């Protein structure tokens, strides 16, 4: 029987990841001069979870975590950015099998792949999805939302590049590499 649903492990990862997302979003945002745009240290964590558990978990943690954190902190949810966060997690999560973290592999090739994917994901999320959503849903001025999107792309891309890479390297180092165990004579 082919089970196409979510595993218990992934459902638990979504719940725990969303809760951690809310806490990090609340306490690790660094304001920027661009209105309503922060350096978000939660995005390396989202990239970390997406890289370990895949696209569905990445999307779900980003979407649920962002929606809850917006509602808790501001009393309302900014849906265009919530969707963009989910898409960011989803795109990064698409590469999780190629990263091969479960086998303890995160060398230069995987670091480059991870960062190319996360940069593309940031561009699509913050320069395409979020600004267009802001214009369509909230009738925001285009020049404002694209400046916010570019600022978010740069700050999130850099934070994921540095912190996300460190988190994934540390995680991979805790895994036993395939073929590293040998039977003693």
Curated annotation (Swiss-Prot):
It is found in: Cell membrane. One of its GO terms (cellular component) is plasma membrane. The keyword Membrane applies. Gene3D superfamilies: 1.10.1760.20. Its main location: membrane. It is a multi-pass membrane protein. Keywords: Cell membrane, Membrane, Transmembrane, Transmembrane helix. Pfam families: ECF-ribofla_trS. InterPro entries: ECF_substrate-spec-like, UPF0397. The chain crosses the membrane at residues 11-31, 45-65, 72-92, 111-131, 146-166. NCBIfam families: PRK13661.1 (NF010182). Belongs to the UPF0397 family. This is UPF0397 protein LBA0922.
